[in-house]
Amino acid sequence: MSDSFDAAASHFHARSSVNDSSFHLSRQEEAELLEGALHAPYPEELLFDDDEYTAKTQYDGPRYAMPTMFYPNKPTPGWPLNYVFGNERSRFEKILSNFVLRNLMLQVLAPCFVLLWCAVPMPRYEDSQGTVRIRFWFFLIFYYGIYNAVGLLWITKLFHIYSVNWCPSKLGGTITYILFWMFSLLVGSLVVYFTAWRQITFTWITLMFISMIIPIGISFSKLWKKHSRRTAQFLTQLALLEPEVRSNAVLETIGWKDAYAHYSWFIVVLLVTLLVYIVGEYLTNLYMSTLPHSSTVAIMYVYSWTGTVSLCNLVSSWILNTKTHSYALVTVFKLYFELTLQVYVRNLYARLESPQQFVLVQIASSLTMMSVIPLITMSRTVFRLNVLMTKSMDSYVVYRKNMGRNFYVKCVASNVSMLSFLGWSLILHFGSNAPLYPYFSFSKEEPYSFKLTFYASTAVWISEMVASYLTRLIMRKFYDFEVALEAIRDFVEYPDMIPTFIAVSIHVLQNVVFSIISLHF
């Protein structure tokens, strides 16, 4: 243990979750115990500074008893937002309190990045049979390369929120990230270049899945090796220790096992997340290969996809809340599942044939999930039912905060998904890459049209924003809860959520665009 460990424990996340009332290792204590296997993503001197940081206060109602602390180093290592936020907590809070800047950063930056990515003209040529083909190497390095880089960044930021890093400490995060990215492109090109598999979109999606799962395997294998060696040493040496030393060794080993168990559950959630990713891509290919669909089939698709993602969201939230005790990870994974759910439903709009179908899909998905369910679940009646069924020890104040957090995440996902859908509907219908995306061609022989899709989707977005605004007013008046204010406090307390929000948004949006491209090399 380092000399500053006791001081750090009082400064850094005394409890990782605001809604956990039992004793658990702090996130920094776990990072300290895991350090031998997985080094921390930030320099140690930035995490242990007794004079600069004040103790973390716990949430207790609409107001904090005292100002929350801010780690100026936390959002900055290797991340350009350092130059925007600076190193002062007051400046950081001021930026987040600005409605325009906050929403530009969290809800506009990711869609703009993805729209620019898919708008770049892809070099093409016609073969002797008149088939339009893509230049393979441009596609590999630029199109798939950026897609792969964002996926690796998203996985890396999740590890950072957990205060560990999957990269070898000798190489460092940046060098390892670049080398692994180049290696994944090299292996991918060798696998698909000489086979017909490269024409299949799902092949590239599978390669992306493998690229993201390898860091998880690396980190878990390192941790398992450390755990096995440490357990063997403990059992061998325990009998030789003095009674007092033996007691301390037992306590430290118990702490290590807790940290190992929590990290193992974190890995399980990552695997569930990647499973949703691969299932979503498969369902997209299945849905597109069986067009056209009736209103009934479209609604069944929406509900089946909603049920699948919601179930995975529920399981992941339960694991993160009860096993890893990380509020920040719960929030980030909720955004992933909500955005995955909504953005796939948005793309369904391009195959709806009448305004009536838009209304049915909207009632089945967005309005119900954004307004009706949040208002019902925040009531004290539902809270009491939740306590009765789950035996939760959370107070109503903490429960209300969690429900408000869920609603805020839904709003972010709604705006990001719809802004992106409207943007790439325009770009992929009128832009130079339109031949590669027949899904947005909207030929005159088809019952659906670009005009109906664009204007009906805009009307849907307006209705969602109105419903969201009314829901916020009801929460403020009847539940004494300020959605935006609590979100700002969360970001101040967990700054790493900001770059992770951006990374996960870009990754999910790219998943959808990539799944509908028509590949001919």
Swiss-Prot record:
InterPro entries: C553.12c
Gene Ontology, cellular component aspect: membrane
Compartment list: Membrane
TM helices/strands, residue ranges: 103-123, 136-156, 177-197, 200-220, 259-279, 299-319, 327-346, 358-378, 411-431, 450-470
Membrane topology annotation: Multi-pass membrane protein
GO MF: transmembrane transporter activity
Alphabetized UniProt keyword annotations: Membrane, Transmembrane, Transmembrane helix
Protein name: Uncharacterized protein C553.12c
